Amino acid sequence: MSEKTKKTKRLDDLNFFDFDAIKLGIASPEQIMAWSHGEVKKPETINYRTLKPERDGLFCERIFGPTKDYECSCGKYRWVKYKGMQCDRCGVEITEAKVRRERMGHLELAVPVAHVWFLRKNPSRIGIMLDMRITDLERVVYYASYVVVEDCIDSVTGRTDYKKGELLTDVQVREARKKHGSRLKVDIGAPAVKKLLSDIDFDKEIPTLHVQLAETQSELERTKLIRRIKTMEEFKASGNRPEWMILSVLPVIPPDLRPLVPLDGGRFAASDLNDLYRRIINRNNRLKHIESLRAPEVMIYNEKRLLQEAVDALIENGARGKFFIGAGGRPLKSLSDVIKGKHGRFRQNLLGKRVDYSGRSVIVVGPSLKLHQCGLPKLMALELFKPFIIGELMKKEGVTLKAAKKMLERVRPEIWDILEQVTKNHPVMLNRAPTLHRLGIQAFEPVLIEGKAIQLHPLTCAAFNADFDGDQMAVHVPLSLEAQLEARTLMLATNNILSPASGRPIAAPSHDIVMGISFLTKVKLNDFGEGAVFGSMEEALMAYAYGKVSLHARIKVRGITAIKEDGMNEKDLKNVNTWKDYTTVGKIIFNNNLPEGWPYVNGAVGKKELAAIIDECYKSKKYGKYETVQLLDRIMKLGYNYATRSGLSISIADMIVPAAKQKYIDAAKKRIKEIQGQAEAGIITEGERYNKVIDIWTRVTDDVAVEQFKEMKKFEEAPYSGEGQRFNSVFLMADSGARGSRQQVRQLAGMRGLMAKPQKKLTGGQGEIIESPITSNFREGLSVLEYFISTHGGRKGLSDTALKTAEAGYLTRRLIDVAHNLVVMEEDCGTTNGVVVSSLMSGEEVVEPIEERILGRTSLEDVIVKIKKADGKEEEKTIIKEGDSITLEQSKLVKKYGVQNLRIRSVLTCESKNGVCGKCYGVSLVSGNISNVGDSVGIIAAQSIGEPGTQLTLRTFHIGGAASRMLSQSQAVAELGGKVTFKDIKVITNRFDNKICISRNGAIFVEAANGTIKEYKIQYGATLHIADKVTVEKGTLMAEWDPHSIPVLSETEGTARLTDVSEGITLQEERNKVTGVIERKITASRMGKKNPRIVIEGKGGKKVSLPLPVDTILLVENGEDVLAGDILAKIAKASGGTKDITSGLPRIAELFEARKPRNAAIMSEFAGVVSLETSPKGLVEIVVRSEETGQVKQYAVPQGKHLVVYEGDHVGVGEALTDGAIDPHDVLRVKGIKEVQEFLLNAIQEVYRLQGVTINDRHIEVIVRQMLGNVKIVDAGDTPLLKGEIVSRATLLKHNAQAEKEGKKIAVGDPILLGISKASLASDSFISAASFQETTKVLTDAAITGQVDTLQGLKENVIVGHLIPAGTGISAREFTKEFEAAKKK
């Protein structure tokens, strides 16, 4: 027996699962012949009568193997006993039919043809090798021009008349032949290219090219030479030969990979590849035939060209713009099309497979389930657990397989007991599409239920983003024991309480539950039973049960509240309204459901408070996960119970319209009339008028909303009359966070507010706001005009949703691709580098305090604070030690002692060779423990960033396009009293005796008595109301300015002369439609370079030049006398449009793709003083002169750019000199890697924060690390790298280590910022890159360089079918390695 099994195991069978790397190369003709099992000579496929494959055709059994297992074509041999024999009649080997999936054939081409990938794919590899233009190459390959294949030297003069590689037309060849005869060697078509390629000798060529590279001066020539050298060295190193890029033998892929599928009605559905192969065989055979007939050259060339085109079409149809069309007029799918794109091999079959043992059904709510359970319909479970049931039946009943299947089909009663038993401890996985993050698939224990719908626990809805309006979910059964174990320990719903994106609870109560709890814990004055004093909780609950006291009545209970408060007499005890410390029965009921020993919660409990309780419970050492799960289930039951009892319903009377609404609107209209008057008088410009109007309405809308909530709250705080409702339902829902936002309630009963206009804005932004708001609300009803205005907003929301979901999905895909191979690879990399974090500020307010940013991160230093002891002495105390993972308690101490900043470890500075280390990543956000080796932090980061993208795009339409604008700040008011200090403020007095600030980066510092200092930035042109070194009270107005425009001020007395300002060229006069005033605006000159400016000619002949950017509104006439502080012109600021995530999502994509902004700001490369000059071309030039080094740099300012610095200003390193977006590449170049990391992190977080989405910093850090993972070689040293090449940091380190070992000069690289798409394609793994984008290009490159994919990342392992190197897959790998090592010993 053992002998026999050994024989059947064929030695040439590879084990397809046991390999560590994949290498790609170019197949040589010998290699193709070695793969082949025979030549395909005929274009026939199968015989239409017998339906058997034709001999020597595309499905021939002799070449590719038998169509039926162990049966030859003619039927002489059939059965396994003849295995391995070859039939003497039909020549078919007796073997399994599945060899038809792996055996290849070949086609001898009558003439070599060029491989279209190497010829056409940019950059053309054949072109680089021969140093020929792609157009010239095509002329040769497609038989339009001849090429000289050897230098032709004139025998008389010794001159080279025709150089190798030169192109000649038909006529030129005839002429040259007359002169040179047979000395002229020319050829045409792919054979000519093949000859040229085979003549290349790398050992001679490469040194020659290096010499040329050293000598050349031209940058273009350099780039070209570097590319040639690189390609040649790649060829040499990989062992490929250049002539293999020309095919003389064509492989024919196995027939089962291009099948003919019989359809009913005797027709066949054929794979397109068969058509393409047929066309090649036909043309090849015809060419052979014509050649044997000695046909004229023209005919033969034409036929050869057709063969070349046919092979092109097989490899990549449409590569040259011409498609081969199949039946039905669609282009045929070539080999390239089969592998690329969403429906190609990579993405359709290798990365996304269909799964057996799965089902799907509609979901319904299962409020009686525990958190770890789901309701599974019995019929579904019966089908899903079939194999397990059959196994049990065979074991229990002792029946055969067949009988067990019969029993199952008839659904015998004993089967239900077995099903119960089989599903008892067998978790199933539920998944809801789209699976945007890891919580989209969770494991549950099934509870068998009647009916056909799956029951889902309400608290998991947030993670799945599920609701019960007809959503469907899929069920998957983990089969193996390991899979079950992983599902239970890693994926069970009880392990997924925290969101991996923010580390906050995601399984927190919402909607009805919050409503119920909020109702339960509310207080109502004058409710029955008020003023009762109870001896214990139980007594109070009993009184409630007997109906003696209401749920919301104010009561006192011994042990919870103070019975006698300080300074209270007996009379006060009877008067409830004097009580300060009281509780309600509802609050007692709520607190009884909290974990034992939890401090009594006596406030109102809404959504936020509940989430905080869950968070604290989960993260505290005392309670932990198990207790939190119990708590969640108790809160859910309680919430549903009291939501039902509350009898909540909304009536139109609940929507209270604030009484003061009309007063606000009238005041606003009056104010707008005044502004209109100012505009008509020409005091303010049209742009300013518009901005002011919008500002007024935005304020009014907010005021009305505030007023409305006040009135609703009043109703709640009013004493209960004994009948009717106790609370306002609308307010209860919005206030507790159960449903609806302030904005929605405002639209119901306040005023709808401003709406966005459909068309694009003149300034290029979108969402211009209509300046007359909708003053009605939905309760009063909208007028026809108002309704019409709002329709646009509503529709925009819906269409945005559809378009943007795809956009967000694509962003997630790119993020996953760039970060998938980042896994925690070691516990500690031992680095001493890190980043400094402090509280994030936006202007004056703290956006994210330091204690939130450091939570769960590893500290790089001891944090020592000074504490005052009771005796007044100070002592030092260490609150955080170096290397600590900062806990919740420690972060609270940081807040308490006011620590300003802290150095922490970060993924950005982690020094792990591949992947990151646990210490740098910090505590896992999901578990709250330090990250384990194998955590796939890259994927989690990508999901956390991508998932809200989709959510946000889906959220715009709820508000119906109501314009939300940020109110512009226009004054500096002292927030605390203290002493004033001016910094960098130059002041002049204008003709009205006002003090005007004329410095660009001035600031006022106010120092309070306790030493706190507050900084206020003062704008250029601001009016100052205080002097330097005075003391101000809190709330003093210190300065104010116009928020909508920047003035151009005269700083001295003199005469204004307008230079380069000429009507119709750089000045445009237009009459304002609304006000009828004529405005004079500076425009970009179409004719020549003009540089509009005002020159002030002062006393003593001193001249000051003030540049006027485009869109400046001119307020002075030429030759007018001006005084210091006069406003000569105004530059309008573009006002913010509506802040939609629509602008947010493209912004995030722009940052991650590291795109250069359209109008980037010019940055100063060093610190210095600014002076303004005019370049020879007439443009403004900013000159920065360093005071320390004397270094000078000029920056030309393009037309239409606004300056933000002026003559004599001081600028710092990397400070913007003009307006415009900041280009991250500039930040990297000027300020370095740390700054660009911080810039990207803050810019991305800002977009999400605007939408109220919390994402932990480290997810963005992970992606930014990947974006900065490559370097550009500046000096190659003695390494094989080339100057200007972009390689990963790991590659550079590897080459440098090798060079150091050999005592050679190492290479130097500059860090470079790549966008996520580019970074994905620059991945070291070609399998991962090919499955992302540009598949054919990636594969072409990989084949030429003979690239080896060592299968380090997740994606490539999924594709080749290995366990992924993350999580349990890593431990499996380690174990296998150790096992192999032990075996060797």
From Swiss-Prot:
Gene3D superfamilies xrefs? 1.10.132.30, 1.10.150.390, 1.10.1790.20, 1.10.40.90, 2.40.40.20, 2.40.50.100, RNA polymerase II, clamp domain (4.10.860.120), RNA polymerase Rpb1, domain 3 (1.10.274.100)
List the SUPFAM superfamilies hit by this protein, alphabetically: beta and beta-prime subunits of DNA dependent RNA-polymerase
Sorted alphabetically, the Gene Ontology cellular component annotations on this record are: DNA-directed RNA polymerase complex
- Give the Enzyme Commission number: 2.7.7.6
Coiled-coil residues are none
Q: List the molecular function annotations (GO) for this entry.
A: DNA binding; DNA-directed RNA polymerase activity; magnesium ion binding; zinc ion binding
InterPro entries linked:
DNA-dir_RpoC_beta_prime, DNA-dir_RpoC_beta_prime_bact, RNA_pol_asu, RNA_pol_N, RNA_pol_Rpb1_1, RNA_pol_Rpb1_3, RNA_pol_Rpb1_3_sf, RNA_pol_Rpb1_4
Q: Which reaction does it catalyse?
A: RNA(n) + a ribonucleoside 5'-triphosphate = RNA(n+1) + diphosphate
Amino acids binding Mg(2+): 467, 469, 471
Lineage top rank: taxon: Bacteria
Task: Report the family membership.
Answer: Belongs to the RNA polymerase beta' chain family.
Entry protein name: DNA-directed RNA polymerase subunit beta'
UniProt source species: Elusimicrobium minutum (strain Pei191)
